[in-house]
Amino acid sequence: VPEIYEGTIEIKSVARDPGSRAKICVHSQDSSIDPVGACVGMRGSRVQTIVNELHGEKIDIIKWTEDLPTLISESLSPAEIQKVLIDQDNKRIDIILTEENLSKAIGRRGQNVRLASKLTNYEIDILTDKEDSERRQAEFKDRTETLIKNLEVDETLGQLLVSEGFVSIDEIAQAEPENISKIDAIDEETAQELISR
């Protein structure tokens, strides 16, 4: 591809399963150039030359972007992603999608998700929307039970605190009384008592 050789188009990332499939992220500083179109060529002529050179290895060419959710969605194509949850600290991404898109996102023997993971340098977990809902319900229940046990509050108050974003004992201990008392059914005195526990 002449544009790559000339430096007009830059290869940002490559992930390969040699002999089977490759994913390549390309980018151009020149907004008038479509990096994917330039690499694919007229009716696929440019990419087909490379595919033939690699003895039939399939090549997915993806437009690189700094927007990680978009890059992940593109790299897991043709699956349609509902939600992307990113944990920058642990370099992990949770992908939420429908049951119908699960096999597309994972690919044969996990190839699609494995290559997307290599391409982005993030560990990727794929969950159906049902699994995500069950996980969030379990987390909510665990957090509520922790508050009930450690703060000696009833279930309603525990659920209320968790639903308002106070998900740990430390968060409550470090909170200002006026932030907790903004919650319906909690006055300043109760808030102060919760913080002191």
Q: What kind of feature is each model-predicted range?
A:
Residues 1-197:
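RNA-contacting regions in translation and RNA-metabolism proteins
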